[in-house]
Amino acid sequence: MITRLLKVSLALFAISPLVNVGPVNVTALLLLLASVLQLSTQPQQFSLFWRQYWVFMLTMVALTSAFLLSNLLNKNPNTLDATFAQSRWLLLLAFAAPALVYSMKMKDWRDVVYFSASITLVFTIVYLADAFTYLKLESNLILDVIDAQRSDLLRPSWVFNPHPFSRTLIAAMLLLLGCTLVSNWGILRVIFCLGILGLGTLLVLGAVRTAFIAVAVLACLSVFLYRGKRLVSSLSAGLLLCVVGLWFRGQLFPMDQTDKSLGLREALFEQGVNAFLATPWFGGGYQAARAISWPSELQQFAGAQTMATTNTHVQWLEMLVSYGLLGGLLFTALWLLSGWLILKASIQGFGTRKLAGVLLFLNWTSLTIASFTTVYRESEWALWLVTLIGSLSLIELQKKSSGGTPTLRETASL
């Protein structure tokens, strides 16, 4: 019963970035509660798991301590709340990873994948219908039904900012691509391919330059990570998607608007660097970048593009501004450690496990590329968590199949 609850919680959390920020937070809480409940029945799972990955756990604890220290030094009136707001994803990972790795079997993961793929197809149809009614009929009919507002009037990116939504679309495309390659039914392959085509259309309409660059990088990277001809040929189509997307963006945004956008990013980057240099060791505390003022010549344009919320538009710089050199270095170490674990999963195993590992690493690469042009929101953190936990599960499955580290049951019997 608890395992089923855990599986359902993971499935809902995995698809929540497709919906909005609210569902991500709700499903994250549900997954945390389910994980704690699972670990309460077998508490040795927690220590057994993190003994193997003690360096990663130590880095998470150190990073959380850096968050707390920075907020204390800056006399944040809500120190604990601010620290929790930034470190909640690490807390979720600490409990969810051992609970899922030791409780979920290969069949359970397969069920989660196909459930997520099915829901992705449904949302793809909804989003395409919304884009059609908005662009062709000039109607917000679908958004009116759910009483939501469009964040960007030029690009039909659901109710999201187009940038985080583009990362979700890329992750969804990788998911459907994996289902296409492993499915034995021709009709399912056709359906999944149509879903990929629909998601690609939405990605083009979003006109996010970084997303197209990421797709091209993933297409090239797949050649080195996976020798399967179908995967290489499928992801090579990403090069065509990149070209079409960049062309559409050029049609949508005149050169003067592009120059303003780049000017805004350059100005914010410069002010972010200045803010970091003002408090280089421990930073300015949680969301310190919001104190950055817009350049006067870009004030109106900035408000229209970012809904009047300020950040540096670079995840790495954002961490330096908020938590100084200490927090920035620890965050970088944590991110690179997660990348190493995900890469490790991609080079082990064979067949379906090999394919899954490669797709997970490609998704981590997509998120990494995005970090140089945006600040992570709930959707990116959720995608990172699912990617990392999936990779850790693949590593543990490989250990079991090769007779490596003893399982929890074997350890208990010693």
Across the structure, where does each feature detected by a protein language model lie?
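A membrane-periplasm/extracellular boundary helix in multi-pass inner-membrane enzymes
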Residues: A129, G206, V223-L262, E270-A278, ...
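Long extracytoplasmic/lumenal interhelical loops at the membrane interface
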Residues: M255, D259-A267, G285-Y323, S346
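Alpha-helical transmembrane segments of multi-pass inner-membrane proteins
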Residues: R110-S151, S157-Y226, L341-K344, T365-T368
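Transmembrane alpha-helices of multi-pass inner-membrane enzymes
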Residues: L30-V36, L174, V358-L414
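A conserved mid-to-late transmembrane alpha helix and its immediate loop/hinge
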Residues: S157, G200, A304-I342
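Aromatic-anchored transmembrane helix interface
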Residues: M57-S65, N78-V101, D111-T120
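N-terminal signal-anchor transmembrane segment
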Residues: M1-T41, L63-L73, L367-I369, L385
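Hydrophobic transmembrane alpha-helices and their immediate junctions
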Residues: I191, K229, Y323-S366, G404-T405
